[in-house]
Amino acid sequence: MNKVKLKLFYIGLTLLLLQSCSHKMSYSSITEPIDDKKVIALSGQRFPWVVEIEQRLKNKGFTVLRYSSVQKVTEKAPDKDISYQQASARYVVQLNGFAPLEWAFRCMGGGYKFNYISAEVIDTKTNQSIYSFNDSGYSENCPPVSGSIFTDLVDGINGLWKN
């Protein structure tokens, strides 16, 4: 009986240590919340986990575009015409990360084990990075070591906007 308890203790300790390997970092450079429509474009490769982030952003009220397209706008005035490029989304989320997609490396619940994931929100009007997120470890749906990568990322982006 003591050997069983000792094995369970070591298994629990190992799982606890694996969970603590995650390193989370986020940074926001805005001082005032964004008072604009929740329209953003996602930039980066279209991995399966990007769909998870996109869906969570939509659940928070965002309109998510695949690209921030640009159209030429001309405003006519009596004395002159003004032409400029107008983007369909002022804010772009640049996503980058690596999580193995092979079945042998996926979590049983459908989650992912990220070697790294990073996201940067860029204001295309000022060409400034206004939010940065970096993490590694397990995403949601990875029992028994599930993390909160997607939730933390989406909550961080949502927190930039005035609700």
Spans of model-derived segments:
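A generic local structural motif
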Residues: 2-3, 26-30, 78-81
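C-terminal/domain-edge helix-coil "capping" segments
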Residues: 22-33, 56, 128-163
